[in-house]
From Swiss-Prot:
Principal subcellular localization: cytoplasm
Bilayer-crossing regions: none
UniProt-listed GO biological process terms: threonyl-tRNA aminoacylation
Matching HAMAP family: Thr_tRNA_synth
Location of the region described as Disordered in the Swiss-Prot/TrEMBL record: 1-28
Ranges where the TGS domain occurs: 1-65
Bridged cysteine pairs (disulfide): none
Pfam families: HGTP_anticodon, tRNA-synt_2b, tRNA_SAD
Protein name: Threonine--tRNA ligase
Assembly, per entry: Homodimer.
Length: 685
């Protein structure tokens, strides 16, 4: 979640040889305080430099303000150093891990004797404020040799590892090493110049700690050194830092709203789903109300796929391991698969093998099985494009540390399609598939998109460079033709082909990766897929992988947070609830709900002993879109009164009109929450 930062490019600034960048910035009249203060500069090669940097020749640089994303990132990295200094002041035996800036904040990992408590975080915040108030200067120092660095950092084992292992220099979370020099940043007393604290770091940093006007520590958690569960256990402290108190307050309010919308919290409050310990991590179960929402999501998707010419298939959950040897998954995706199940082995009495067993795997992806369906009989060019679709359950061994509610699970159902077409059909099929995906997402109320093009990872791919280049170029053409912003994702593709992913912004402006469209020339080769062309020649089809929701579970979680649990009426598990003013009027509402049920509406009457106002509060909390009230006048007039989630109301609507209004609203699949203002025009019809 990010509050948008102004990304205006400052005019180039000339820094004379022998002059610090900071001096040139001040003499040019740039702001010296406030959210637009310049914190670093960008040189001609795009590298961010400290304001203390002194070029040897005249250079043009771009001043970078605190209120830009790059400026914020530098502030957050410096705040991570302040945090680390505070931790070592409060916990002198703490050893330093890594402390990078991340989206909207920063973290630092520490080896300490026990987990941090909320009270610890409060103490650390107090200590950080003292450090910031002291205006310590960040001073870059080049270490003469690796040996000198080892001596200076002898008490920091994790830093020593980073010095010796340069494999992390391209990792954005490894800020300690990189480039041609080994550098340490000292925090200096502004009056005496004495070193107060230091850390191995490649920088850059803000000039002084006073350039951190707003920060907050948000939480702590367990972590592993370098993210590897086989490494040392560490404690991670997260925080956020901003260019102004106003910007931070805006972010914290956004964070609070995100917590209110957290699908895990709402899943419990609305009785939608749960994660029983007995099943294991990342394996959700959907309760009846959640099951209704999921069924409605799937049913609408099915109807749209039928209209678009998809054919439905079904495949098993497990398969022999040989299938994934053919597909390449065991070579390239084994770490993401559950371990093999060795079955069907028979032993003699002496323990020797009479009949060898076989390895079976839970399927991590549906594509190999869909290829077997394509290959089950001869195919003609007349059948292409062939669009095979399945709500297919797959299982992936996600590390426990990354599992998160419904948005990152181990068992999931993908709305998975594989399209087989000729090369001549490829571009048109990609174009129509992308448009189909975007239109269907809009039908669920998501309509703010951009595209991301993931290209080849040079260390992890199969197939020829020529084929990859053709596939990538075609996807790029289709993405650009859509009119949406196309953002590059270098090296982000799966091993078998480049992809376009649809990135969706929700009601809070957060970005979620949703649909993927992946071009694959590789698997048809590995599975020897063929069709007979119009010239009678056997030809390889082009294969397109396509998942619209990503997974049903993930999409469910995203929609829950997008709507804050107040699902559109067509998806709501309970669409209408009748609330009598007194028990005597309950039968009237029961008759109304019978009519609604006959029209396919999910309706019920609250017969509880609670007072009417409490019933209204309860069903408002449960996000019921339509509440129908009935008192003496309503019964006498054969009418009901509408009450909506926002507290608005329309009184005295004839029952038949009320049924019509509700069924039409649901039938149109309106994604807005019904209110008196929105429903009133239908009353007048």
């Amino acid at each position: 979640m990010t509050s948008p930062a102004p990304e205006h490019s400052a005019a180039p600034l000339r820094v004379p040889a022998g002059t610090t960048a900071g001096t040139a910035v001040r003499e040019a009249g740039y702001p010296t305080k406030g959210p637009d203060v310049i914190v670093v500069v960008r040189d001609g090669e795009g590298t961010l430099k400290d304001l203390s940097w002194t070029p040897e020749v005249d250079v043009d640089v771009e001043p970078v303000a605190a209120s830009t994303e790059d400026g914020r990132s530098v502030i957050r990295h410096s705040a991570a150093h302040v945090l680390a200094q505070a931790v070592q002041k409060e916990f002198p035996d703490a050893k330093l891990g890594i402390g990078p800036p991340i989206k909207d904040g920063f973290y630092y990992d520490f080896a300490v004797d026990r987990p941090f408590t909320p009270e610890d975080l409060a103490k650390l915040e107090k200590r950080m404020k003292q450090i910031i108030k002291g205006s310590q200067r960040f001073s870059r120092r080049v270490v003469d040799s690796i040996e000198d660095a080892r001596v200076e950092l002898a008490d920091e084992p994790f830093k020593l590892e980073l010095i010796d292992d340069k494999s992390g220099i391209d990792d954005p979370e490894i800020m300690e090493v990189g480039g041609n020099e080994l550098t340490i940043y000292d925090n200096l007393d502004p009056r005496t110049g004495d070193k107060i604290w230091s850390d191995l770091c490649r920088g850059p940093h803000i000039p002084t700690t006073k350039h951190i006007p707003a920060f907050k520590l948000t939480r702590s958690s367990a972590a592993y050194w370098r993210g590897n569960q086989d490494n040392a256990d560490l404690q991670r402290v997260y925080g956020t830092a901003w260019e102004s108190t106003e910007a931070q307050d805006e972010y914290l309010e956004l964070l609070a709203e995100a917590e209110r919308r957290d699908h895990r919290k709402l899943g419990t409050e609305l009785d939608l789903f749960s994660f029983p310990d007995e099943l294991g991590s990342g394996l959700p179960v959907f309760h009846p109300k959640g099951g209704i929402i999921r069924t409605e999501m799937e049913n609408y998707s099915r109807s749209r796929h039928i209209e678009a010419g998809y054919e439905f298939v079904n495949t098993p959950h497990i398969t022999k391991g040989h299938l994934y040897e053919v597909s390449g998954h065991l070579d390239w995706y084994r770490d993401g698969m559950f371990p093999a199940m060795h079955v069907d082995e028979e032993l003699n009495e002496d323990g020797t093998v009479r009949k060898p067993g076989q390895d079976y795997y839970l399927k991590p992806m549906n594509c190999p099985m869909h290829n077997l369906i394509f290959r089950a009989r001869g195919r003609s060019y007349r059948e292409l494009p062939l669009r095979l679709f399945e709500f297919g359950s797959v299982y992936r061994y996600e590390k426990s540390g990354v599992i998160h509610g419904l948005t990152r699970v181990r068992g999931m159902t993908q709305d998975d399609a594989h399209i087989y077409c000729t090369r001549e059909q490829m571009r048109d099929e990609l174009t129509t598939t992308l448009q189909f995906v975007l239109n269907l997402l809009k039908d669920y109320g998501l309509d703010d998109f951009y595209l991301e093009l993931s290209t080849k990872n040079p260390d992890k791919f199969v197939g020829s460079d020529d084929v990859w280049e053709e596939a990538t170029a075609t996807l790029a053409e289709v993405g650009e033709a859509s009119g949406l912003t196309l953002v590059p994702d270098p090296g982000g593709a799966a091993f078998y082909g480049p992809k376009i992913s649809v990135q969706v912004k929700d009601a809070l402006g957060r970005t979620w990766q949703m649909s993927t469209i992946q071009l694959d020339f590789n698997l048809p080769e590995r599975f020897e897929l063929e069709y007979t062309g119009n010239d009678g020649v056997k030809t390889r089809p082009v294969m397109i992988h396509r998942a619209l929701f990503g997974s049903i579970e993930r999409f469910f979680g995203v929609l829950t947070e997008h709507y804050a649990g107040a699902f559109p009426a067509w998806l709501a598990p309970v669409q209408v609830v009748g609330i009598p003013v007194a028990e005597a009027f309950a039968d009237h509402l029961f008759d109304v709900t019978k009519k609604l049920k006959a029209a396919g509406v999910r309706a019920e009457v609250d017969f509880s002993d609670d007072r009417m106002q409490k019933k209204i509060r309860n069903h408002t909390t449960q996000k019921v879109p339509f509440m129908l009230l009935a008192g003496e006048r309503d019964v006498e007039a054969g009418a009901v009164s509408f009450r909506f989630r926002d507290g608005t109301q329309i009184n005295g609507i004839p029952v038949d009109d009320a049924v019509r209004i509700i069924t039409e609203w649901i039938g149109r699949r309106e994604n807005a929450s019904p209110t008196a203002e929105l429903v009133q025009p239908s009353v007048a019809q």
